[in-house]
Amino acid sequence: VNPPITYQNPPVGTKNGVTLLNDSTALFQLYAPEKDHVYLVGDFNGWLPSGTYHMNCSLDSTRWWLVVGGLSPGQTYGYQYLITNQARYADPLSTLILDPNNDNFVGNTTFPNMHPYPTGLTTGFVSVFQTTPPTYTWLNTGFNRPAKKDLVIYELLVRDFVSARNYQTLIDTIAYLDRLGINAIELMPNLEFEGNQSWGYNPSFHM
């Protein structure tokens, strides 16, 4: 039996997706109008719906949201939205997902330490987020971008350009591109796509 829905607007300015409030608290928000009930399930609750993870609904009945605390700083978590006790969905604004049908084709050199899929606990695509994600500090602060009229662009697909299929090998190949007179590279779509063989022009999810 579903509990009563709490109708309440999320904090002003909250965006859809996951918003990290601090290193142990996250706010989840899903745009899903005309739905009866939405639960948040994931690594943090054994992938089981409960009243604690029954999401609040905005006053206009379009956004479902919930604040989850007690998360471990620096930890990676998988999650889904369970809609009306029937179907489980990954977050459409995910920046990283787990695919039970294709992740086994991705080697550890391409994606080290991939978050494990919760086999036996759920089905379908799973969204992944990390509390206190690492930040990147630019090392080359003196880089000057070439003028547009001077660009010599090489478009490439990492998977096909280097046999190791990873960015570090591409970085190690920059000198070769420089010898060719290339001063810019354009990566073919480096985002999530359906299946496991694609040039990236059939995007799936946000990233």
Which sequence ranges carry the predicted segments?
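Short catalytic/ligand-binding loop motif for oxyanion handling, primarily in non-cytosolic enzymes
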Residues: 89-90, 162, 193-196
